[in-house]
């Protein structure tokens, strides 16, 4: 079985990944800078509560779901190209774990190391299961955790499985033919996300993580964001946005780690660490996204992979992969 992802399909996934990366950066930057969430009297700042409803919990599920899709595509590629496909997957996850371990020294709470561990513990065994079982486990894992634990990183394994099941069901292969289905999901997800977002906003900020409000609103918001973006990418104005997001998505690993370095370098010099200036912190986030978008686009004119993506790929296939750009389209995994 081989999912040969066509140009439109992979470009759409890259754009969605780039979109998720931007949203995660906004959330990560206020965590890294430790920006104040309350005023001097201990009352939560309205802007923090509003930004939480717009950003927090919305982009992490997208990234996790895409991780499961990527695992499925890599598995297909490994089965085609290697006599020991599971060893290929193990190397990829171990390499990600090492990168995550180093990254965690600078950004505690980062996602790469948990992704690698969950991939080894859950995705690898799940790859041997029938797809209906993977889908069922993904649904139970995602929504069960959302209701019982209130979300967070615990949602990742279920979302991994949903991504794996989606790719194995052939939906990724036929994404460009599913415009009406995407529109139907968006039409249902958007009002549901708005209702859930109002529920989250009306829940006292300091009580959010003891209720399922964040997880439920986050999952519905993520679904509305993704389907809305996919619809936007199919019309002419969306192509401009796609040109910005795709390079960011192709270099997602490099940009995710690189953003941490840029935040740690810039925040103290700009006096943002521990401050209450959300405008300045959000301005820094926009600046980092702009710099990374330009650098990613320029880099991809010369090279096939980002720096960390290239290292990751070399370890995955246990060979030195050519990095210079050629006329022959590269494989996504």
Where do the PLM segments sit?
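Alpha-helical transmembrane segments and their immediate juxtamembrane cytosolic regions
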Residues: 2-333
């Amino acid at each position: 079985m081989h999912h040969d992802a066509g140009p439109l399909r992979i470009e759409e996934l890259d754009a969605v990944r780039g979109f998720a990366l931007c949203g995660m950066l906004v959330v990560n930057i206020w965590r890294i800078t430790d920006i104040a969430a309350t005023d001097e009297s201990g009352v939560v700042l309205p802007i923090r509560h509003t930004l939480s409803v717009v950003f927090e919990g919305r982009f992490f599920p997208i990234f996790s779901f895409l991780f499961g899709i990527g695992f499925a595509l890599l598995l297909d590629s490994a089965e085609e190209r290697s006599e020991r496909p599971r060893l290929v997957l193990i190397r990829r996850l171990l390499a990600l774990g090492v990168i995550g371990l180093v990254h965690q020294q600078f950004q505690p709470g980062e996602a790469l190391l948990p992704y690698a561990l969950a991939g080894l513990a859950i995705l690898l065994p799940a790859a041997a299961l029938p797809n209906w079982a993977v889908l069922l486990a993904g649904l139970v894992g995602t929504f069960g955790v959302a209701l019982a634990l209130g979300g967070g990183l615990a949602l990742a394994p279920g979302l991994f499985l949903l991504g794996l099941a989606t790719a194995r069901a052939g939906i990724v292969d036929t994404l460009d033919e599913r415009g009406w289905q995407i529109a139907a999901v968006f039409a249902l997800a958007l009002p549901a996300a708005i209702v859930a977002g109002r529920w989250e906003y009306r829940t006292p900020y300091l009580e959010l993580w003891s209720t399922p409000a964040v997880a439920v609103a986050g999952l519905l918001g993520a679904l509305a964001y993704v389907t809305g973006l996919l619809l936007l990418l199919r019309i002419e104005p969306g192509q401009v946005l796609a040109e910005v997001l795709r390079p960011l998505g192709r270099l997602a690993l490099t940009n995710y780690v690189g953003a941490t370095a840029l935040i740690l370098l810039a925040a103290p010099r700009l006096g943002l660490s521990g401050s209450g200036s959300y405008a300045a912190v959000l301005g820094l986030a926009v600046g980092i996204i702009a710099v990374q978008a330009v650098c990613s686009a320029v880099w991809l004119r010369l090279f096939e992979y980002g720096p960390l993506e290239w290292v990751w790929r070399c370890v995955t296939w246990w060979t030195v992969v050519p990095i210079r750009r050629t006329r022959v389209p590269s494989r996504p995994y």
